[in-house]
UniProtKB/Swiss-Prot annotation:
Originating organism: Halalkalibacterium halodurans (strain ATCC BAA-125 / DSM 18197 / FERM 7344 / JCM 9153 / C-125)
E.C. code: 2.7.11.32, 2.7.4.27
PANTHER family (alphabetical): PYRUVATE, PHOSPHATE DIKINASE REGULATORY PROTEIN 1, CHLOROPLASTIC
Keywords, sorted A to Z: Kinase, Nucleotide-binding, Serine/threonine-protein kinase, Transferase
Protein name (record): Putative pyruvate, phosphate dikinase regulatory protein
Taxonomic lineage from the root: Bacteria, Bacillati, Bacillota, Bacilli, Bacillales
Keyword Kinase: yes
Sequence similarity: Belongs to the pyruvate, phosphate/water dikinase regulatory protein family. PDRP subfamily.
Record's catalysed reaction(s): N(tele)-phospho-L-histidyl/L-threonyl-[pyruvate, phosphate dikinase] + ADP = N(tele)-phospho-L-histidyl/O-phospho-L-threonyl-[pyruvate, phosphate dikinase] + AMP + H(+); N(tele)-phospho-L-histidyl/O-phospho-L-threonyl-[pyruvate, phosphate dikinase] + phosphate + H(+) = N(tele)-phospho-L-histidyl/L-threonyl-[pyruvate, phosphate dikinase] + diphosphate
A Pfam family the protein falls into: Kinase-PPPase
């Protein structure tokens, strides 16, 4: 490019963020030598007045307009007015919308920014999963007040897998084990009872689960952890804590994690 010569300009116009159109323009521009082009992004274009302003600016700069406008009225208006002003345009998303509509036999939703809402939903899920890992097994009481939901119960009542499963439903879940020798965190009693779910299980089933756990670890099943009297003591203690909090309680006996998680989800949404 000659010294002092103005770089070619491309206006990127979008009814959302405009990142997609800008990436396409820059990818195309990278195929050319020289000093490149100047990209001027105009996001969130939702009215005809803004379209008129952009067309005027593009005309003055002898620029072209690349756009991703999904709302038909605004897209049509831009095309008509740009043609009248003799400003070149490139419709980046329109042809793809038409082809996919033809392929799927469906009409587009014509909603700006859907892809970013999908991304936001994905990151909420990731955040919830990280939260469940960080505040698993009562390892940090601060998680109790930060959580959408707190699960409480004795060991091996599916608190951890439930926390992970509910995280995939975008819920931030902390869980706290209840052990007779350890006083629960005081934060637990400051929460609304609606934010706490107690998990109970039949002594016999818990005995079997714990015995199998000890076997997996190579330990003797006679250990206190799988002793039926000790289990009944733990369950009675946990029941007392749940009554003290006044939280709803779910019996997880003979229930799959998915079934219990769906019950919790429906309770939480009420």
């Amino acid at each position: 490019m000659e010294l002092g010569k103005q770089r070619p300009v491309v206006y990127v116009v979008s009814d959302s963020v405009g990142e997609t159109a800008e990436l396409v323009v820059k990818a195309a521009a990278s195929q050319f030598s020289g000093a490149g082009i100047e990209v001027r992004r105009i996001p969130y274009v939702e009215d005809k007045e803004t379209v008129d302003e952009v067309i005027q600016l593009a005309k003055q700069a002898d620029a072209i307009i690349a756009f991703t406008l999904v709302v038909p009225g605004i897209r049509t208006y831009l095309l008509e007015k740009a043609t009248e002003a003799k400003v070149e345009t490139v419709d980046i998303i329109g042809p793809m919308l038409e082809k996919i509509s033809s392929l799927t036999k469906e009409e587009p939703r014509y909603e700006p920014g859907i892809v970013y809402r999908l991304d936001e939903d994905y990151f909420r899920k990731v955040e919830a999963i990280e939260f469940a890992v960080k505040y698993d097994d009562g390892r940090d009481p601060r998680g109790i007040v930060r959580a959408d939901l707190v699960l409480i119960g004795v060991s091996r009542t599916s608190k951890t897998p439930l926390s992970q499963y509910l995280a995939h439903k975008r819920l931030k879940v902390a869980n706290v084990p209840l052990v007779p020798e350890v006083e629960p965190p005081e934060e637990l009693f400051k929460l609304s009872p609606k934010k706490v779910i107690g998990l109970k299980i039949s002594p016999e089933q818990l005995n079997g689960i714990r015995a199998e756990r000890l076997k997996t670890l190579g330990l003797k099943s006679q250990a206190n952890y799988a002793n039926i009297d000790r289990i009944k003591e733990e369950l009675a203690y946990a029941e007392g804590i749940m009554k003290r909090i006044g939280c709803p309680v779910i019996d997880v006996s003979n229930k799959a994690v998915e079934e219990t998680a769906n019950l919790i989800s429906s309770m939480f949404q009420k």
